[in-house]
Amino acid sequence: MIQPGELLRTIHSPEELRKLDETQLIQVSEELRQFIVDNVSVYGGHFAASLGVVELTVALHYVFNTPVDQLVWDVGHQAYGHKILTGRMENFHTNRTYNGLSGFPKRSESPYDTFGVGHSSTSISAALGMAVASQYQKDNRQHIAVIGDGALTGGMAFEAMNHAGVTNSNLLIVLNDNCMAIDPNVGALKDYLVDITTSRTYNRVRDEVWNMLGKISKFGPNAQAIASKVESGLKASLLKQSNLFESLHIRYFGPVDGHDLNHLVQVLNDLKDIPGPKILHTLTVKGKGYALAEKDQVKWHAPGKFDKVTGQIHVKTYDTPQAPKYQDVFGNTIIELAEKNDKIMGITPAMPSGCSLNLMMEKMPDRAFDVGIAEQHAVTFSAGLATQGLIPFCNIYSTFMQRAYDQVIHDVCIQNLHVIFCLDRAGFAGVDGPTHHGAYDLAFFRCIPNLVVSAPMNEQELRNLMYTAQLQKNKGPFSIRYPRGQGVMPNWKTPFEEITIGKGRKVSDGDDVAILSIGHIGNYVIEAKALLREEELSPAHFDMRFVKPIDEEMLHLVFKKFKKIITVEDGCLMGGFGSAVLEFMADNNYAAQVIRLGIPDRIVEHGEQAELHKECGFDPQSIARTVRNLSGVVLK
């Protein structure tokens, strides 16, 4: 287990941190940063974001009386230092491991994790709700939301600020401005924040006036009114344009150096006494303190395990060619298709490297768009493109598509527009946990009229489904879901073939039991059949490809021949693929024993994908066991 520094090891709670002399905080920060480097290099995890807020994390817990004062982290990639300072240092080596600490703040894990996070742009809304509740209950608490400039591009953050500005709630928004999300930040807001950081005249003169008057709370309402008038005059005369946050009635302070710990402590102490909603703009460097991470912030967002001295990232080596990641199949295939079809466009909400649309952005910059953390906009922007005869491929992680459900229905499917949704990270997201699992898309998509819902079993099917979806004769909305991680076919670049919409395929014949699978999880069925071969059990296997329209012709054949049927999916059982099969059985008056394997009706925590598949009973061994049980075979 990694050992912390001599001062850090004495801190098991923020209460102990607050007992230190302020002069000791720099040492705490240095040891905290090193502890993060030591742990992530050995165990993996999100890296650069947490390094960038070490000083801010120490200052917040030093100044505010957490957990009485409530601290909300947006997304949570940057919260490792927070976890270490709040009693989880000794268990931090279990971070993002099965049955270990969550990689994100989680209410059930610690009272210091006041709000569970994982998706972006939620912190201001949550902290404002807490602040209004405290005000109603007459609790004298501070409420702090820490949000990055990337997350600030999400519309929900602006909805929250719009509301906060008409309250007098005790809310402090700390803007962690590092010009990055996972990829470099995009959009006009980025340029606006850069303008603020360079307009220092207003901030310098205002600081001089404040220093002259002293801390306004010491002088009573008259001095406060004078200071307010002086400040208003400064704004009018020195700012070229009105401050966005001030226009929303949120008092703006900054920008300040987010790595100047002593100054942060001073500023945060001052802000504690200023009532109403306010924002502190801090400038930080993502990856601060680890030179390689500062230099390449995208690569070091979550690099995996690495040599902390050399920076060499540990990558598995193989003697034989390996299958690609599904995201790379998408990234290369959309370029191939776009080279032949000039109507194809690519859209992603802030995940270009994660979904590999960055390949198209580099090669065809006028046809590929990173629209920021804005899933709702991404979908309706795609719909707008489609109205003009273009063919948008809108790539959104399955878990983030939840945020744009209304737009899929209202803006795309009701109008039957030719938008192609590529849902990356469908199924279990692994160690990122329940906030990132893509468990629900099959269920929430298959109930929408006009929408084709498909899932490839391998890389070739992904390519061919993408090819099929963009054909002009297929004018309606089309979705393709595929998992995180590696495929199964090293030689995947084969000529395109059109797939008949709504038609599955028989993978293998068999006797007695039929297994119907959807998507990549069908490869587990192949492994299960191999396990059963020595037992002379040979279930038939059907790769259905489509949940909607489902292949009714194939289902008729299956139900006429087999009375024992297993469905397998890496999505939620309620309303999913297996439910569609049961609906078909009921509607057509078939009688059969049907066992559904998939994600049960509960929140599944984090762990490696294989661990979670086993837990939920649809790994190869569990599938084989289900076949044995249906066949009445008992292992000796």
Swiss-Prot record:
Q: Write the Enzyme Commission number(s) for this entry.
A: 2.2.1.7
Looking up SMART domains in the UniProt record yields:
Transket_pyr
**Positions annotated to bind Mg(2+):** 149, 178
User: What is its pathway?
Assistant: Metabolic intermediate biosynthesis; 1-deoxy-D-xylulose 5-phosphate biosynthesis; 1-deoxy-D-xylulose 5-phosphate from D-glyceraldehyde 3-phosphate and pyruvate: step 1/1
Q: Which InterPro entries match?
A: Dxylulose-5-P_synthase, THDP-binding, Transketo_C/PFOR_II, Transketolase-like_Pyr-bd, Transketolase_BS, Transketolase_C, Transketolase_CS
Pfam families assigned: DXP_synthase_N, Transket_pyr, Transketolase_C
- The source's domain of life comes to Bacteria
Q: Where are the transmembrane segments?
A: none
Does the entry feature the keyword Lyase, yes or no? no
Keywords per UniProt: Isoprene biosynthesis, Magnesium, Metal-binding, Thiamine biosynthesis, Thiamine pyrophosphate, Transferase
Residues annotated as binding thiamine diphosphate? 77, 118-120, 150-151, 178, 290, 375
Cofactor(s) needed, names only, are: Mg(2+); thiamine diphosphate
User: GO MF annotations for this entry?
Assistant: 1-deoxy-D-xylulose-5-phosphate synthase activity; magnesium ion binding; thiamine pyrophosphate binding
Report the record's Gene Ontology biological process terms.
Answer: 1-deoxy-D-xylulose 5-phosphate biosynthetic process; isopentenyl diphosphate biosynthetic process, methylerythritol 4-phosphate pathway; terpenoid biosynthetic process; thiamine biosynthetic process
Can you state which reaction this protein catalyses? D-glyceraldehyde 3-phosphate + pyruvate + H(+) = 1-deoxy-D-xylulose 5-phosphate + CO2
Family the entry assigns: Belongs to the transketolase family. DXPS subfamily.
What role does it play?
Answer: Catalyzes the acyloin condensation reaction between C atoms 2 and 3 of pyruvate and glyceraldehyde 3-phosphate to yield 1-deoxy-D-xylulose-5-phosphate (DXP).
User: NCBIfam families, alphabetically?
Assistant: dxs (TIGR00204), PRK05444.2-2 (NF003933)
Describe the protein's quaternary organization and the partners it interacts with. Answer: Homodimer.
**Name listed for the protein in its UniProt record:** 1-deoxy-D-xylulose-5-phosphate synthase
**What is the primary gene name for this protein?**
dxs
